Amino acid sequence: MSEPKVRDLQFGVDRLVTNGRRIFGWGWVAHPTHAIAEVALLLDGDGWQKRLPVHFGLVRPDVERVFPLLRNAGSSGFVVTGYPPRHPARKLVLELRFDDGERLLLDITHAVESRQQGHRKFREILWLARAAGRRLRHGDLRGIVRRARAQNFRAPSLDDVDAVQRVLPGLASGPALCVVFDHNLGGGANQYRQQLIAQRLGSGVAVALCTYNLPTLDYRLQVFQPAGGEEVYRISSFLGLEPILERAPVTEIFLNSPVSFDEPLVFADWIAAMRAAHPKARLTFAVHDYFAACPSFVLLDADGRYCGIPDVAVCATCLPRHQARYVALSPPTEIGPWRALWGRCLAAADEVRCFSDSTRRLLLRAYPNLAADRISVIPHQVDFVPSRLPAVDHSAPLVVGVIGQISEQKGALVVKEMLDMIDREHLDIRVVVIGALDVPVKSERLRVTGPYRHDELVGLIEANGINLLLFPSVCPETFSYVTEEMIRLELPIVAFDLGAPGDRLRGYGKARLCDEISARSALATLVELHAQLAAQEMPA
C-alpha cells in the first residue's frame, strides 16, 4: 500500500462492542481519490483467525457534509456483526480493498468496548447443556445505524429477583398478559408488532415485549399497560422472563421474529418448553421470514441464488460456506440441529401464521409433517389508496421506477447490473429509485430520490417520467406491501416469479414475470413490455 494512500485515508469507528461471544459495530471509511470496493473485519485470537464480511456502502450524509471531498463519502458507511469461534479476540483489523486492487489493513482493536455479562444463571446453563452438541450458526441490517442513537442505552438492568419485585406486581394484577418476542431491525415485521401491541392494549391486555438490541448486545424488556405508560429494562437473556411466565396471567405468547437473537436454538427449545409448561398460554408463530427453515432467512444460498429449500443434504453443504452478512446474525450451526429445534418450536405452536400461500408452501417443504390445521394464511391489510392514478406516457423513452428500500436481497445488485448494461450498451433508458439503494452506483442514468411518503408517490412517478415499474427482489418475500401499492397505482410491473409477489402478480394483467432471476432477463422483459405498450399507444 502506497504511503500517500494510507496518509489520506479517513475513517471513523462509531461503535464496536463485544460481549465475548459476539461482535457488533458500525462506522465509515473513505479516501479522497480512490473508491473502496470491499471491506472485511479480520479477527485474531489465540491460535485462531476469522474473517467477517462487512456490509459496506451504507448511506452517511453526515460524513458527506463534513468531508465533501472524499470519494463516495455519502455511501461510506459500514456495519458488521458476527461470532468469533473462540474467546477472546485479541486483535481486530479492518481489511480494505480499493478499486485498483490494493489492500490496506487498519488495526481498530483500540475501539472495542467490552460488555462481559459475567457468569450465566444456572437456569441458562441448563438450557445450554440441553442443546449440547449443536454448533449454533441472519434487510437486512439496513437501518440499524440510523436507529442506534435512539436506543435506550441507560435502561436499568433486570435480574430474576428484580423481575419479581419490580415488574410482576403490575402485571399480575391485570386480567391478561401477552408476551411478544421480536427483533429490533426495523421493517415490516416491526410494523406488524406495533399494530399487534396496539390491538392487545386496546383490548385491555398488558404486553411484555422482549427484543434483542444489537448496538448493546443485550436484550430489552418493554412493559406496556392498557391504561398507558411504558417501562424499559435491560435483561441478559430471554430466560429472565421465566418468573413472569410462571406467575403472571399470561394468555398469549407471540413469536413475531427472533432474527438476531443471541442463542436462536436455545430460544427455539425454550419456547417449546414454555408452551408445554403453560398450556393456558396460546403460542402464535408468525412467519415474517424463513428463519425457522434456515439461518439464511431470505432463502438465498451461499452463491447468492434463491434455493427453494432443497433436500437437507444440499443445505448441509451450503450452510458451512455461506458468507452472507445476514447469516452472520446467527451463530455458526448445522442444518440438522437447526431444523430439529425449530421444528419442535413450530410443532408446539397453536397457530403458525403465514401472510401468503407461497410462504405456507415453502414452510411445508422444510417441515412436511407440520400439522396443516395449525397453519393459517392471513394476508396483511394494505391501507394505501392513491388519491388519483399517475399519468404515464408509454410512447416516451423507457423510465424504470423502483420503489422502496432496495437492499441486496431486495435486488440492489440487479439494479446495479442493469445500469451497467444500460451504460455499456448506450441504451436510452433511465432508472429512478423512489426510496434508497443499498449499493453505491455511479451512473448518469440513475436517480435516487431518498425517503418518500405514500402521498408523494403519484407526484414522484409523474415528475420523473416513470412509465414502467420493476420489483427486483431476488428472494421469496413472505408478503410485499410495495407490490400491493404498485398494483393499486395500476401501472405495468416487471418482477421475478418468486414468493408472495410472484403469486400476486401472476393474477395481475399488467404484470410480466421474468424467465430467470437475472439483471439481463429483467432488462429484456422491461424493454419488451415497453415496446408492446408503446405500440398500443401509436395512432392507428
Where are these regions (language model features)?
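A conserved mid-protein helix/loop that constitutes part of the nucleotide-sugar donor-binding site
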Residues: 191-195, 407-421
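Membrane-proximal helix-turn-helix segments that form the acceptor-binding/catalytic region
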Residues: 308-352
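Helix-loop-beta element that forms the nucleotide-linked donor phosphate-binding surface
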Residues: 344, 348, 360-382
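Conserved donor-binding/catalytic core segment of Leloir-type glycosyltransferases
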Residues: 353, 393-410, 419
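Nucleotide-activated donor-binding/catalytic signature segment of Leloir-type glycosyltransferases, i.e.
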Residues: 435-464, 513
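Nucleotide-sugar-dependent
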Residues: 469-481, 502-503
